[in-house]
Design a protein with these regions (language model features):
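Short, polar/charged, Gly/Pro-enriched helix-capping and turn/loop motifs at alpha-helix termini
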Residues: 41-42, 65-69, 134
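Conserved GNAT-fold acetyl-CoA-binding loop/helix
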Residues: 36-57
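Acyl-donor (CoA/ACP) binding surface of acyl/acetyltransferases
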Residues: 1-24, 29-37, 73-184
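Short, conserved alpha-helical segments within structured domains
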Residues: 43-47, 68, 143
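A short hydrophobic/aromatic micro-motif that marks alpha-helical segments and, especially, helix-coil
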Residues: 47-49, 62, 170
Length: 184
């Protein structure tokens, strides 16, 4: 599978596009301790240098066909321009076994508006229809109930509980794995 150009996806509430350096300051402002405690790859405090590394990592992942990380723009009707509200991506793409992982987060002030649910739907549709994946999984902490609801609304099912999976300070946190299979 080769990517010719970065895909842009569009839904009723959001547009998904390639991340850019110009997004860095907004991402820092949206990242809070409340959000980062539920993310596997982010530790507070999240600084501009961290975001720039993430954007470079995202661009490299796309170039190397390992991941597709999208910026999420909210099509808020009351705003003259779209608002960046965070990121979603297909990661760890395995073209041989036709599977990948999904990860996402939404700025706290934009949660509860259906944005994550629509973003996940757009990305799994792209993964199944364009990338021809047969399974997409998500790793989520058991206490992250909003993310679990988003996955369940999109027909993901809990497939595994991994005990003491993710390091946190001097201990480890449990993780749940949710998976959706391509029915086509």
């Amino acid at each position: 599978m080769t990517h010719l150009s970065f895909p842009n996806l569009s839904g009723k509430l959001v547009d998904l596009r390639e991340l850019s350096i110009e997004d860095a300051i907004i991402i820092v402002s949206l990242m809070s301790h409340d959000i980062s405690e539920y993310l596997y790859e982010v530790s507070p405090p999240y600084k501009i240098g961290d975001v720039l590394k993430f954007i470079k990592f995202s661009c490299d992942g796309f170039r190397l066909h390992k991941s597709i990380i999208f910026a999420i723009d909210y099509k808020k009707k009351s705003e003259p321009i779209q608002l960046l509200v965070e990121t979603i991506g297909i990661k760890d793409i395995d073209y041989v076994n036709k599977k990948a992982n999904i990860g996402y987060w939404i700025g706290k002030q934009y949660q509860g508006k259906g944005l994550a649910t629509e973003c996940v739907k757009l990305v799994i549709t792209y993964g199944f229809d364009i990338l021809k994946l047969i399974a997409i999984s998500a790793y989520v902490f058991p206490e992250n109930k909003p993310s679990i609801r988003v996955l369940e609304k999109n027909k993901f099912v809990k497939t595994e509980v991994i005990k003491e999976y993710h390091p946190l300070s001097n201990s480890y946190r449990n993780s749940l794995v949710y998976t959706i299979k391509n029915k086509k």
